[in-house]
């Protein structure tokens, strides 16, 4: 018996020694490279959601089935829509009740009152290994996060690049805690004690929370923010019940996009023609939408339709601009959309405080030698549903927020004391003016692979040059204000 026990212990010691030697050898091999590992933190929609992910029952979290079709049929909502378009009278509250019934089967993505996922919904691609093992992802799209990852992999090798996927609905602070574990693992795998963080859209909010909670770890070498939501977006004003629909604003929006949108994702020229052909129909729809969002009806619209669909998703609350948050929270408390002391309340107020500390946190990083770069878009109009529809934007996030403080002209206008040659931007009000770049005409995250727009992003993530406007301009052709032409070639803005 003693011999068997001794043999077992010796075998266990040998196995442990071999494992430790293998891990040490891997880390030692990684250390031979001077390449800093890059962790990319993507935005909303980068990772698809599934019910029962990674099981034989994996499927779409939203089911378009007889429940939905029966609701459409039973409510006769299609007939109401046709009457609205024709200019006939439809009672708003009756329509809201019908809309509530039709959308009931689409509520599965909403969270519970504590901001937690309901049911078995999540992502199927939480990869803890490098993108060297996920090369198919790099070719899944020629733009957005796959294109960003691909150019970084081209520059430093896919074995040095990791992608932190997450459920975009969840609280970004909880995501940041998971990111901390992820980065710890990356450091072990790579043999390096620092990483470069490249974040996109909502991912910038996750990184903001990570910096707030874990900056004392001193494990960030540089951080690059792309089209960031870290200071919110005016679309977040919808939580203030600010739903403003103006036909002129919609027409201006379509006209501006038809004139300046370069990518081929959406044909705004054709949409512009359709709007012109059905001008009366559009007017009737806008008039009815304004009835739905009137003071008399908007509470019912929110409580019956909007909030059951997405009102408990923490990350959407965390896209409210800092200065709008208190008023938005007060309005939603009055509406019963959130309760003081609930998990959702605690999560969104916690991130609001973090959002307010971002400047302090980034300055703290800079004092420790961390390189910072902020890239944002402008020259495209914001969605025409709030009072800030005229804001410069990348079609989703306002330039003033993505740049962390730039003063911007309304679409088609000029701003006083402009620092950009075209008169659209005054960057002197940015919190980090010397670390912020503006690209005109590029839609949100349209960093198309094979273009110099994409190469610029890859350069910021992997260069050894100092990340400030002057140093980058001296070392490259990249200046603080750039724009694209009809061939998607980026160059400096001159006028």
Q: Where are the regions a protein language model picked out?
A:
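Short amphipathic alpha-helical surface micro-motifs
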Residues: 20-21, 143-147, 354-357
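Sec-dependent signal peptide cleavage junction
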Residues: 15-32
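Alpha/beta-hydrolase fold catalytic core
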Residues: 159-166, 170-173, 295-390
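A generic structural signal for short, solvent-exposed coil/turn residues
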Residues: 6, 19, 155, 366-367
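Alpha/beta-hydrolase-fold enzymes
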Residues: 248-335
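Generic structural signal of hydrophobic/aromatic residues within well-ordered alpha-helices
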Residues: 68, 78-82, 253, 257, ...
């Amino acid at each position: 018996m003693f011999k068997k026990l001794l043999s077992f212990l010796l075998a266990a010691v040998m196995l442990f020694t071999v494992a430790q030697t293998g891990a040490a050898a891997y880390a030692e091999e990684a250390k031979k490279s001077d390449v800093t590992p890059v962790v990319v933190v993507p935005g909303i929609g980068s990772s698809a959601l599934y019910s029962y992910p990674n099981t034989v029952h994996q499927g779409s979290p939203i089911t378009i089935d007889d429940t939905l079709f029966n609701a459409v049929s039973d409510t006769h909502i299609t007939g109401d829509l046709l009457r609205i378009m024709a200019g006939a009278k439809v009672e708003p509250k009756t329509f809201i009740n019908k809309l509530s019934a039709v959308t009931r089967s689409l509520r599965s993505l909403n969270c519970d009152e504590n901001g937690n996922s309901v049911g078995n919904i999540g992502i199927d691609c939480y990869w803890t290994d490098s993108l060297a093992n996920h090369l198919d992802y790099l070719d899944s799209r020629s733009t957005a996060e796959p294109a960003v990852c691909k150019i970084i992999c081209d520059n430093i090798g896919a074995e040095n690049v990791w992608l932190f996927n997450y459920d975009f609905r969840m609280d970004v602070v909880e995501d940041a805690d998971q990111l901390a574990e992820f980065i710890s693992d990356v450091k072990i795998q790579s043999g390096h004690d620092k990483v470069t963080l490249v974040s996109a859209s909502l991912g910038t909010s996750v990184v903001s929370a990570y910096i707030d909670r874990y900056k004392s770890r001193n494990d960030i070498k540089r951080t690059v923010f792309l089209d960031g939501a870290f200071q919110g977006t005016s679309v977040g004003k919808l939580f203030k019940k600010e739903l403003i629909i103006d036909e002129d604003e919609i027409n201006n929006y379509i006209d501006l996009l038809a004139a300046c949108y370069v990518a081929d994702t959406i044909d705004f020229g054709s949409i512009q023609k359709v709007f012109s052909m059905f001008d009366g129909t559009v007017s009737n729809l806008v008039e009815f939408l304004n009835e739905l969002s009137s003071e008399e009806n908007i509470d019912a619209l929110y409580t019956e339709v909007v909030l059951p669909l997405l009102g408990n998703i923490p990350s959407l609350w965390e896209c409210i601009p800092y200065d709008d948050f208190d008023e938005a929270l007060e309005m939603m408390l009055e509406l019963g959309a959130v309760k003081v002391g609930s998990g959702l309340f605690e999560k969104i107020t916690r991130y609001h405080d973090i959002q307010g500390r971002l400047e302090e946190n980034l300055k703290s990083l800079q004092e420790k030698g961390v390189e910072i770069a902020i890239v944002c878009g402008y020259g495209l109009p914001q969605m025409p549903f709030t009072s800030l529809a005229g804001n410069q934007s990348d079609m989703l996030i306002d330039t003033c927020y993505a740049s962390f403080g730039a003063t911007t002209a309304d679409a088609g206008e000029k701003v006083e004391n402009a620092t950009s040659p075209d008169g659209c931007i005054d960057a002197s009000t940015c919190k980090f003016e010397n670390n912020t770049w503006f690209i005109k005409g590029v839609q949100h995250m349209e960093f198309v692979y094979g273009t110099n727009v994409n190469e610029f992003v890859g350069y910021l993530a992997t260069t050894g040059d100092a990340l400030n406007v002057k140093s980058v301009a001296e070392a490259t052709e990249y200046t603080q204000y750039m724009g694209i032409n009809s061939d998607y070639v980026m160059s400096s803005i001159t006028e």
